[in-house]
Amino acid sequence: MGKNISLWDHCDPQNHAPQIVAVKLSAKGERSVRQHHPWIFDQNILKTNKTPKAGDVGIIFAYKSNKVIGLGLMDPKSPIAIKMIHFDGGAEINEAFFLDLFKKAIEKRVPLIDKTNAMRLVFGENDGLPGLIVDQYDAVLVVKIYSLMWLPYMALIKEVLLSLCAPKSIVLRANRHVSRALKLEEEDQVVLIYGSLPNPEIEFHEYGVRFLAHVLKGHKTGFFLDHRNNRHRVGQLSHGKRVLDVFAYAGGFGVHALANGAKQVTSIDISAQALSLAEKNAALNEFTGKHETLCGDAFDLLQQQIKKGIQYDVVVIDPPSFANSADGVDLALNKYETLTRLGTQLVAKKGWLILASCSSRVDMDQFLQAHKKGFTAVKTQDFNLIEKTGHDIDHAVGFEHGHYLKTAYYRRK
């Protein structure tokens, strides 16, 4: 049998040299481009001068003239058929073009350097590079692609990253959509494209707290970097306190709590492997408090804790996305309401209830309304909303559909 074709093999520019495609849009599509929205949906494309392939450069012409109003990368198998990379005229898509975009993105993250050595350097559409993520874990970069259109450019992007960041290693990962389209075996969906990686568990720090990220097998690119500020905030609230971390995964909130002097932390997750990683992360740090892990369904375990009359000073509930499509929003809101109802019953007087959502399809107002329903269900008016948070600067949002992370801090009277 021959060698499997890896993700990196598909990135060979000789497989498909990007072509230029002239594009005319509907009035609605053109209005979207003029407003600098990064997405063009397929129904807003009136005509092209040739059949596009993924990665071709679409030159967008004005509806009533031949004036170029922007450039996008063609992604014909996606409902978002063109993803914009340049507005207000034309440009040459070459190494210098990408070097400028990456340089601007990295410069935005400079204020984080004294807080952490792990951050998102490129955040897709929000940095002018739709469907492309670059995360840094110490000296290792992890690039994740969410669209086939990036394949012809990866060799060039690799050189840009080497030039700007001088990493020891670069890992390339594909999301589920790309992996399925390329029919990649699981072991071929992640590939080391530069340097060596003796240990795929990379240690990093944030606000003095140490963690491990598995850059080959961990969720996303290895860790959930977007909650950094919230983890730090929970740590600040946890000194001498009893803390419950629900949907703990690798223990982000709980480890910050322990490192900041929490008396006790209980971490809940359905995955025994995740809880093992949480314990491993905790062990990287000095702490004197007790760390307990509970493996099982969070809803069931919270009910059990309530029946036992257990209460905590800080309760953090950070579930996975419950709404992966528009059809899932109502179910997600019901689950947020249920988690609020359960969480309120576990918070001691003067304690904190911290509720998070990572679903882009649920906005902050809907999220807060679900909390109100949860409070009403247990007939309590004891919780005051103290603070709402969103994205840290390495996950800054540049367009209306980019918001996904929201966290609400409630204090019990």
Language model: regions and residue ranges:
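Non-catalytic accessory regions of SAM-dependent methyltransferases
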Residues: M1-D138
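Non-catalytic substrate-recognition/targeting regions of SAM-dependent transferases
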Residues: V122-D135, L151-F224, H232
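Conserved class I S-adenosyl-L-methionine
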Residues: G240-Y249
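Conserved SAM-binding loop of SAM-dependent methyltransferases across substrates and taxa
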Residues: A250-K263
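Conserved SAM-binding motif I beta-strand of class I
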Residues: Q264-D269
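S-adenosyl-L-methionine
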Residues: S271-V316
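S-adenosylmethionine
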Residues: A298-T376
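C-terminal catalytic and target-recognition region of SAM-dependent MTase-like enzymes
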Residues: T338, W352-K413
